From Swiss-Prot:
Family stated for the protein in its record: Belongs to the universal ribosomal protein uL1 family.
GO MF annotation, one: rRNA binding
HAMAP family linked: Ribosomal_uL1_B (MF_01318_B)
CDD domains: Ribosomal_L1
Protein origin, superkingdom: Bacteria
UniProt key word Cytoplasm: no
Protein name listed in UniProt: Large ribosomal subunit protein uL1
GO cellular component: large ribosomal subunit
Length: 229
């Protein structure tokens, strides 16, 4: 494990590691102990009682946070014809088809989210080895494979967050910036919480959310009481 820096250790002293805080208390504490010299993201980490190896327990989706993420997302869209025009009108940063596929094959990756229409997926599929490991591959579950490119671009620009359970059964997701008003962060948290709960697989047994913490980008995690979830 990497050695923690002095600032981290000082921040960690202010967090009671034996206590599970309310969401409101946890967010206030994360804001208080954040030591970054930039506007850090505030992130949640859910540990879920699921087996990601099972197809029906691979939790994945997207949610539009009511107060956004505080980050401007660069969106590209793979589309042709009318959908390409709609994507441009909606404010997509780059729109293309085969030319865009070739551009990415050439090493260009200056974007945060990729959207594709279903007819384009045969070509976009060639980028799987490039986009897949980076979490940039369009996927129907996150609303990024769709004919309604206008809605997709609007949602992403408005603060949509994609989430996915990892191999350890943990979902990491940003819910805003530390500079956000605490009440807005709580609203964003509740929006994320709702979709995580609704995504519970029917086959999941026992307590679904086994632990939950919030933290800033480099700050210590603050445990949240999950007894009511």
């Amino acid at each position: 494990m990497a050695k923690k820096g002095k600032n981290y250790l000082e921040a960690a002293k202010q967090v009671d590691a034996t206590k599970a805080y309310t969401v409101e208390e946890a967010i206030d504490l994360v804001k208080k102990v954040d030591f970054a010299k930039f506007d850090a993201s505030l992130e949640v980490a859910y540990r879920l009682n699921v087996d990601p190896k099972q197809a029906d327990q691979q939790i994945r989706g997207a949610v539009v946070l009511p107060n956004g993420t505080g980050k401007t997302q660069r969106v590209i869209v793979f589309a042709q014809g009318e959908q390409a025009k709609q994507a441009e009108a909606a404010g997509a940063d780059v729109v293309g088809a085969e030319d865009l596929v070739e551009k990415i094959q050439g090493g260009w990756l200056d974007f945060d989210v990729a959207v594709a229409t279903p007819p384009m997926m045969a070509q976009v599929g060639r980028l799987g080895r490039v986009l897949g490991p980076k979490g940039l591959m369009p996927n129907p579950k996150t609303g990024t494979v769709t004919m309604d490119v206008t809605k997709a671009v609007n949602d992403i620009k408005a603060g949509q967050v994609a989430y996915r359970v990892d191999k350890a059964g943990i979902v990491h997701a940003p819910i805003g910036k530390v500079s956000f008003d605490a009440a807005k962060l709580v609203e964003n948290f509740k929006a994320m919480q709702d979709v995580i709960i609704k995504a519970r697989p029917a086959s999941a047994k026992g307590q679904y959310i086994t632990s939950l913490s919030v933290s800033s980008t480099f700050g210590p995690g603050v445990k949240v009481d999950v007894a009511s979830f």
